[in-house]
Structures are given as structure tokens and as C-alpha cells.
């Protein structure tokens, strides 16, 4: 099985950095339409703010798939298998997968374990025995309905900050945690 079945515009800079003499496609229409999938723990798929997030992504031009965790699987391995299958079965498989839920609690989504900590990166390795991801993976870590409202509202407020100049979208500050912190 070849992943991804269609070339992704979102992965272009990744390809350019990893592949010697990489040639991007000459026509944008040759790329698959951008797609994102949210796998939702608990009842998060019906939450009004999750619905608003889906509507925003659609306005941005994404094909959006909203999948309840009960459909994707109840273990990390079953969710990974689900993702491997959709890469083949969907005409436009997701390039980005967002997990909506914490690693435990009423909105939980299972996780993999690396060392003594939880990790989701394993979900992105869908083909072969390498450490090259076939999808981008992320998690909106929430334990309650109010967590969903707060985090999605912050995300939408940030992304829709039309009152800001272009600098708002071109600069970032990130916080990291050293791996030895546990």
C-alpha cells in the first residue's frame, strides 16, 4: 500500500526537506483537496463549539470528517488501524487528524505509551517501518464540555484575528518541555 495515495500540498515543505531533487507538482489541481479528520471522544462530536470548529475548517476550504471514537476504535491500535484503512478507502484521506479528548476521563481518546509517558505520534506512522509520518496528528486535550468551549473558542479567536496585521499569522512563540521531565 502506498501512502498517501494522492500527493498532499500540506506535506510539500516536508517533502522538499527530505527528498533530494524533489520536484513539486506543476499544477495545484494535481494535489488532493486538503482534508482534516477529528476523532471525538465521548459526546464531543455533538458539542456546539466542535460544530463551529468544523464549520470554520470548511470555510477555510478543508474537507472535514467528524468521527466519534466509538466508530474509530476503543484502543490506540484499533484507531491506528482505522486510520490506515481510511488512507486507502477515502477518495480524499485526511492529511491532518485531530483527537478531541484527553487521555482519560469522559472525553478520552486512547494513546500510545513511550517510556513512561503518553504519545500520539505513533498514530501518524501508517505505512512502513520508518519514522516518517503519513499524516499530521494533534490533540485538543479536554476533560469537560467547558474545556471544549474554552479551547475551541481560543483557537477560533486566534485563527480569525482579522483585526490584526499579517504579522499575526507570521510569528509564533512555542513552549517546549524537555523529554527528561517525565
Specify the residue positions occupied by each region the protein language model found.
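Cysteine-dependent hydrolase recognition
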Residues: 1-182
Amino acid at each position: 500500500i502506498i501512502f498517501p495515495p494522492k500527493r498532499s500540498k500540506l506535506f510539500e515543505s516536508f517533502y522538499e526537506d527530505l527528498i533530494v531533487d524533489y520536484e513539486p507538482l506543476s499544477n495545484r489541481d494535481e494535489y488532493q483537496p486538503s482534508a482534516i479528520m477529528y476523532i471525538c471522544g465521548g459526546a464531543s462530536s455533538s458539542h456546539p463549539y466542535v460544530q463551529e470548529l468544523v464549520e470554520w475548517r470548511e470555510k477555510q476550504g478543508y474537507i472535514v470528517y467528524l468521527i466519534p471514537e466509538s466508530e474509530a476504535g476503543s484502543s490506540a491500535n484499533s484507531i491506528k488501524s482505522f486510520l490506515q484503512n481510511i488512507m486507502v478507502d477515502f477518495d480524499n484521506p485526511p492529511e491532518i487528524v485531530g483527537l478531541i479528548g484527553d487521555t482519560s476521563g469522559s472525553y478520552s481518546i486512547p494513546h500510545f505509551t513511550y517510556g513512561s509517558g503518553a504519545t500520539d505520534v505513533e498514530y501518524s506512522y501508517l505505512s512502513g517501518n520508518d519514522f516518517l509520518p503519513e499524516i499530521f496528528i494533534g490533540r485538543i486535550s479536554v476533560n469537560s464540555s467547558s474545556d471544549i468551549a474554552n479551547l475551541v473558542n481560543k483557537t477560533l479567536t486566534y485563527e480569525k484575528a482579522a483585526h490584526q496585521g499579517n504579522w499575526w499569522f507570521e510569528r509564533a512563540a512555542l513552549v517546549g518541555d524537555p523529554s527528561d521531565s517525565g
